[in-house]
Regions:
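Donor-binding and catalytic core of enzymes assembling or modifying cell-surface/extracellular glycoconjugates
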Residues: 3-81
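A generic structural signal for short coil/turn motifs at secondary-structure boundaries
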Residues: 1-3, 118
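Nucleotide-sugar donor-binding patch of glycosyltransferase catalytic domains
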Residues: 69-137
Length: 137
């Protein structure tokens, strides 16, 4: 699935938050990451306006990745092994994909062993390399 895992996101945020302003849009079921800006009230339009003024979007493949593309913003997106960026990604984004014999799996309802392997193989260091590349381009 498209979930990289809460612990992975925490590790990544902890590596970048001292040098960058990290804004985390939240909803009722969001797990808050301590030490970053997580406004309690941010509707979709406000989030899009903030993204328009941002240097980079980092997150899972999905709605805000498409918003970043529509705004022609740089992005680093986690695809895991769920769906190929060849199908739904944008070539000007840094798309992180777990390409193996079982990819893409398309599993939605549960974390399959393939997606669990993707979480383990796509490391924080891989994300950091993609972030550095995106910010240099």
């Amino acid at each position: 699935n498209k979930d990289w895992g809460y612990e992975n996101w925490i590790q990544l945020v902890n590596k970048i938050k001292n040098e960058n302003l990290v804004i985390h849009s939240t909803h009722d079921e969001t797990k808050i990451i301590e030490g970053i800006y997580s406004p309690k009230e941010m509707n979709f339009r406000t989030a899009c306006a903030i993204l328009k003024l941002s240097d980079l979007y980092i997150g899972p493949e999905g709605g805000f990745g498409h918003v970043a593309a529509a705004l022609r913003k740089k992005a680093v997106l986690y695809f895991g092994g769920w769906i190929s960026p060849d199908v739904i990604g944008y070539d000007f984004h840094e798309n992180i994909y777990y390409d193996n014999d079982f990819s893409p799996c398309g599993e939605i309802d549960k974390l399959c062993s393939h997606c669990s392997d993707a979480r383990k193989n796509i490391t924080v260091e891989i994300f950091l390399k993609h972030i550095t590349k995106a910010l240099k381009d």
